[in-house]
Amino acid sequence: MSTSRKRSNKQRPGASVDPAPAAAAGSLWPPRRLIVSLCSLAAAALMVRAGLLEYVVGGIVDGAVRNIITLILCFSAVMSALLWFLRESGHALAWKQMLGYGLLGLVALGIATLRIERVSGDLVPEFRWAWQKSRDTLLARPVAAPPQAAAAWEPAPHDFPRFLGPTGDASLPSTAPALDPEWTKATPPREVWRRPIGAGWSGFATYGTHAVTLEQRGDEEIITCLALATGEPEWHVPVRGRHQTVLGGTGPRSTPSIADGIVYAAGATGWLHAVDGATGKVLWKKDVLADLGIDAAAHEVAVAWGRSGSPLLLDDVVVVPGGGPRSDGPVSLVAYDRATGERRWTVGDDQISYVSPALVSIGGRSFLVAVGESQAIGFDPVTRDEAWRFPWPSHSNSDASCSQPVVIGPDRLFISKGYGVGCAAFDIGPGADGAWTVKEAWRNKAGLKTKFTNVAFHEGHLYGLSDGILECLRASDGKRMWKGGRYDQGQLLRAGNLLVVQSEPGDVVLVEATPAGHREVARLAALSDQTWNSPAIAGDTLLVRNAVEAACYRLPLRGGATNAAAAPVENAPSVEPAADVSEPAPAPVVEPAAA
């Protein structure tokens, strides 16, 4: 072979190169580095789901944070694999284009056709079609019965007249009938009635043979009174307004308070009404935001999940949260005359949270307590002077405070919240100079992380849902006694030595209130949708509801005693054995009285 031919076979400078070999260099299989990355992301996601991340970063990781972190890890894994396939793999260009454009089309289709209706307590979304209306907008106003005679609105011995029961601490009085925990086929809870209801997280308050709650139907928040025996509407009072957010849901979230035949109700949008229980007539009404000079739009940003404080009846006034922003600073609480609706006084200087005003007894003295956005403050209920305060930081548009304070000793107040904060106990008493002092007794950042549930106290121990799992702490030092039973972001009441747990998915569960361990006694399939509402128990009558339906059950009592308010029915609901583990046309509306 000649020298000239050898030179002709060599690449000449500036000659073009066939791109085929470079394209062929891409592999059809992912490289080792991608496999290692995907395995690492999968392992991290499994650690997060197993709760192991809490041991690394502490109690700030709740169910919602776990879901967010898991979503980020899964998204990172999918995007890593997708980018490799589209940019580095040796697959045909047609396959790459098909996958890329197909995914873009699916994303665009989802954005165009789906909407997030709401999320669970752990931020799991529920979707609906973009053209589908919210369920509450499809409901007509409830049809009311003829007005009741005044004599029909008489109290009963075991009324549940306010949020969290007669004493407002999630514990029924010792005089309440004892529940029989043997929910067997022979003696199950019996369903008395069931009916659709509008949106909202309000609970029931009972007075004699009546049950009152709040609901959202379309653009109206409605005070609804039902016959306790039948569930039939007796009257309703609509109020124009609608609160709705993806994270907080739709509708009112406070529970009415009833005394002397008068219903006091507060809406999520800032109104307060006093209604005659016998007739449904509005006696007086107030726009609390306008009355206090609060900018409504700015208030909705600051208190993002809607006003949730239930009215507190204190002597001759009704006390509700105040709020802000306003020109001369926020107001913690505001009181209105129960008879006339005239504003009587305001106290405090903290932005409101989602905790209701409370009257507690500490050190032999009564205190009006406001748990706000940054402080817990105690006021003398007579003079309204501030007696004490201690910091309890939160933000009412993010890591909010929602749980009621609980007295756990002669001089000790317990307080808790979710979002990784946990709980603490404070000793409150008079100092040497007569001024009241506050000293932290103990703190448990990993215990009783009550996101928007409440705690019951019984025989020296505290019981509550901590990040969705039932937990028992010793009140003297905050030590965890046990933790077990996932009921998600539900609610609970204590009836004697039993905990009545309303799980977020809808089941009602009986659990023994004992520090010995988690002992589930019985389970009732009461509701079948997301439930953040607190249950109510009046004698042997259990009232439950969520944003879709309400139901009434007759519970078996020890000794076979019954409550005449709710008549029995023939059909019994489905009761599961304990786990062996630790509308028609709108009704006429009564014209409200002038504000």
Stretches found by the model and what they are:
Residues 26-576, 580-583, 593-595:
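Noncatalytic, solvent-exposed loop/strand surfaces
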Residues 1-22, 580-584, 588-593:
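Short, intrinsically disordered terminal tails adjacent to the first/last structured region
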